[in-house]
Amino acid sequence: MLRSLVGSEMCIRDRDKYVFYTLMKENGLPVIEKKLINTEELNIDGNYVLKPRFGGSSIGVELINDGATVQKLITNSDLYSQGAVIEKYLENSIDLLIGVRSFPDFDVSEIEKPLKNETLFSYTDKYLENGGLEGSKRELPANLNEQIEKKLIEMVNKINQIIPTRGIYRYDFLLHENALYINEINTIPGSHALYLWKNLNSSKFELLDSMIDEALSRQVDNWSLTGSDGIALKSAKDIASKLG
């Protein structure tokens, strides 16, 4: 099973959308079905979302409805050179974002509902309008019924058991016809979304200080160079002597 083979740090470090999706699916969390694609001919029926396998910030995310367009995009754009995924487009779905911190105690922010101008929550919505991500249009806290809010928090807690992330980070969800799906995790600088905490009496400086304190409190691994000169191997004449 992938959960026993792929470390969570790999998933986070490389921003691998397919690995994250697979980890979530294997652990029973609701996800939108994703498929890896290549340059071979695709038979697509309906609207799909095309994404680079790696990266974030909605760069390279396209709404598509035919295989020929997908082929042209992944063949002619470097954004998909390391792979691409497609997922079914959920019309009228709602994006929901929540911040999480792991220090000094596990805590979650308010839930945000971004107010997008386009069909998808685009790079323009996030970064180019109203002074960037912090100034983009939003509903904070999101006007959600208690059941959806409770379900989202439960999912956050379960994801954190699967991926024990440190620091401050953000989870992105999609809500479609009262069904909630985990979309992705954002751990890169700029995606911390510190504004999510502004109504909870946590300033940016306090949040950043807590990240530094957490980093300083972590155990440091001290590596030794003993044996790296290869003398032991050079003196061994055969496999038997190496094994003792």
Whereabouts are the PLM-identified features?
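Active-site nucleotide/adenylate-binding loops and adjacent lid/helix of ATP-dependent enzymes
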Residues: 13-93, 153
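ATP-dependent carboxylate activation and anion-phosphoryl transfer catalytic cores
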Residues: 145-244
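Single conserved hydrophobic/aromatic residue that forms the stacking wall/gate
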Residues: 1-7, 11-12
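Short glycine/proline- and charge-enriched loop/turn segments
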Residues: 8, 129-135, 186-191
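Phosphate-binding site of ATP-dependent enzymes
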Residues: 66-139, 143-147, 175, 180
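Short small-residue beta-strand/loop micro-motif enriched in glycine and branched aliphatics
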Residues: 57-59, 135, 191-195
